[in-house]
Design a protein with these regions (language model features):
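Glycine-rich, Arg-bearing micro-motifs that act as flexible, cationic patches
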Residues: 110-129, 148-149, 255-280, 290
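General small-molecule cofactor/ligand-binding pocket signal
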Residues: 35-37, 86-90, 139, 179-181, ...
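Structural alpha-helical scaffold elements that stabilize or flank donor/cofactor-binding regions
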Residues: 6, 100-101, 145, 152, ...
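Short, structured interface segments
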Residues: 125-144
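Small/aliphatic-rich secondary-structure junction motif
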Residues: 1-54, 151-200, 230
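A short acidic, glycine-rich active-site loop
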Residues: 54-68, 199-212
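Structural beta-alpha unit
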Residues: 1-2, 22, 41-44, 49, ...
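Conserved N-terminal glycine/acidic-rich loop preference
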Residues: 112, 139-168, 185-229, 241
């Protein structure tokens, strides 16, 4: 996967501005180009036209203002970062226009929040629908970029999504520290205790599961990268959501790369772990939206 073409969907909010600047950092690092896209909602435009029938120039004025604002944003990004940036204004249904534009990009980049809490409820719904339907990786930017990504966390569950998420992490970052993490549990541990299996035997069983997971992580890393020393591995017992958020804090992660964790119904659902991380993490989250095979 290349990162030659990055699409930023912007609503002119501060968070969308952070997303645009993160895209510029990635574009400058990878030699790519970014496009800023603003979608004017067709229903909103129709309502404006109906409301101001006596002012036929209102629609044209709005369109011109949006184009000028977006063009200036692209020019500022190019001047500040050196990244090639262009802009485009579309009119239509927001979700459909973004999805259509993303088909010609290598990655879709979004800000985490909108301008205000009420609007954010709507944007949040749009973002989740995008994650369900988009065929490109989706980067959700949560804070202003501070240079290149330096500490990347990749949670894995050994599903087919794990390898593609790890591959994605290596392509997005050039010199970052990458930590691959897995949370495990002990099957039937409670029943083993009820069956009077000794604590020592259960602990031995737990250690075996942990070692097996470590072996799988190292095999996974070797399948996508030649240099094992570029990666760290973490295998701990517990809930994956808690482990991911704890490791984010401990490692000072500035990016989490995670799969959508779907299966046959992945077009209808975003996995609960992925949704939880998107909601509760402090750092940026890159979601691999590819289908499991």
């Amino acid at each position: 996967m290349t990162l030659r073409s990055l699409l930023v969907a912007t609503d002119f909010s501060d968070d969308a501005g952070h997303a645009a600047h993160r895209a510029a950092v990635l574009a400058a690092e990878k030699g790519g180009q970014l496009e800023l896209l603003h979608v004017i909602s067709r229903p909103s435009l129709d309502a404006l036209r109906d409301m101001f029938r006596s002012h036929p120039g209102a629609e044209a004025t709005l369109m011109d203002d949006v184009r000028v604002t977006l063009s200036k944003m692209a020019e500022d990004i190019t001047r500040e970062t050196g990244a090639a940036a262009n802009s485009r204004v579309a009119v239509g249904y927001v979700l459909d226009e973004i999805l259509s534009a993303s088909e010609h990009a290598d990655m879709l980049i979004l800000g985490a929040h909108g301008l205000n809490p009420l609007r954010d409820l709507i944007l949040g719904t749009t973002a989740e629908r995008l994650l369900r339907r988009c065929k490109r990786p989706v980067l959700v930017v949560k804070r202003p970029p501070q240079g290149r990504y330096s500490n990347v966390l990749v949670p894995v569950d050994f599903s087919p999504h794990s390898a593609t998420a790890l591959q994605l992490a290596t392509r997005v970052t050039s010199h970052a520290n990458i930590t691959v993490a897995h949370a495990f549990d002990v099957p039937f541990e409670g029943k083993l205790r009820l069956a009077d299996v000794s604590v020592e035997e259960i602990e031995h069983y737990r250690a075996q599961i942990q070692q097996q997971a470590l072996g799988k992580i190292r095999s996974l890393i070797q399948s996508v990268h030649d240099d094992m020393h570029s990666f760290k591995d973490v295998v701990e017992r517990g809930d994956p959501r808690r482990l991911i958020l704890a490791k984010e804090t401990q490692l000072g992660a500035d990016l989490i790369v995670i799969g959508k964790h779907g299966s046959m119904i992945e077009d209808l659902l975003i996995g609960s772990v992925t949704r939880h991380i998107l909601s509760d993490s402090k750092c940026d989250v890159l979601v691999d939206t590819s289908r499991a095979k």
